[in-house]
Amino acid sequence: MTDSTRSLRNCLAPAKLNLFLHITGRRPNGYHDLQSVFQLLNWGDTLHFTLRDDGRVARVTDVPGVPEESDLVVRAANLLKAHTGTAAGVDIEIDKCLPMGAGLGGGSSDAATTLLALNRLWQLDLSRTELQSLAVKLGADVPFFVFGKNAFAEGIGEELAEVELPTRWFLVVTPRVHVPTAEIFSDELLTRNTKPVTIADFLAQQNSDAGWPDSFGRNDMQQVVTSKYAEVAQVVKWLYNVTPARMTGSGASVFAAFQSKHEAEAAKAQLPTGWNGAVAESLNEHPLFAFAS
């Protein structure tokens, strides 16, 4: 990342994985209670921010399928302007890398990186807690990315506790299919009564490499998604022939963990022709963590 008084360039918006995802209940308002562990990756979209003197917020790169006015990045910047009353403006460039509808948190991560970067570029000096209170207005995953550490999540995903995770390499395979999150959450076959676990339960298992990630918990959405989307089921089945694998979020991406980059790259090299795979290392904290206190 490069930093100047008028621009911040090469700001990573990292992907996340759900190492497990349990749905423990459903609220009267339709929201779901969940438990999960969020893992940051050193792979994601790259954003560039340049000050404008006219106060406007503008996305200067096209993102296919995402109108500028509804882009979470633009909404995040405008929310920050409205909250602080700053007269500053910004041009935002986005180099998209993460697929949409993949369970990797791409749009949410872009929004969080925008909040953190503009907190620095606009010299707002908002606390992390204040930024998280804004982030929750943008989406359930955005507060996690502002939180900036690997986390055990509860509630609707907004109750976060930092967890220390070992360094691992991941192969993430994304089928060429978009899985709408709302469709999966509303499916009558979705399990919504998984027994709650504790952080201690998870930490007791996370240092064991045997059978990881399926040595702890599951993704309650995986069975619903694989029953509806054959492409996802095919990836899960193929990866399981190599090593234990699990879907992240509501899909469609599926991941497997390895002890080294070499092992992950070797597995990627075996992917069938036309499959989209990425190798990424785990992160302990968000690259812009220092942009809020």
Curated annotation (Swiss-Prot):
It is an enzyme of class 2 (transferase). GO terms for biological process: isopentenyl diphosphate biosynthetic process, methylerythritol 4-phosphate pathway; terpenoid biosynthetic process. GO terms for molecular function: 4-(cytidine 5'-diphospho)-2-C-methyl-D-erythritol kinase activity; ATP binding. Its EC number is 2.7.1.148. Keywords: ATP-binding, Isoprene biosynthesis, Kinase, Nucleotide-binding, Transferase. It catalyses: 4-CDP-2-C-methyl-D-erythritol + ATP = 4-CDP-2-C-methyl-D-erythritol 2-phosphate + ADP + H(+). The active site is at K16, D141. Pathway: Isoprenoid biosynthesis; isopentenyl diphosphate biosynthesis via DXP pathway; isopentenyl diphosphate from 1-deoxy-D-xylulose 5-phosphate: step 3/6. ATP binds at P99, M100, G101, A102, G103, L104, G105, G106, G107, S108, S109. The keyword ATP-binding applies. It comes from the Bacteria. SUPFAM superfamilies: GHMP Kinase, C-terminal domain (SSF55060), Ribosomal protein S5 domain 2-like (SSF54211). Belongs to the GHMP kinase family. IspE subfamily. Catalyzes the phosphorylation of the position 2 hydroxy group of 4-diphosphocytidyl-2C-methyl-D-erythritol. PANTHER family: 4-DIPHOSPHOCYTIDYL-2-C-METHYL-D-ERYTHRITOL KINASE, CHLOROPLASTIC (PTHR43527:SF2). This is 4-diphosphocytidyl-2-C-methyl-D-erythritol kinase. The gene is ispE.
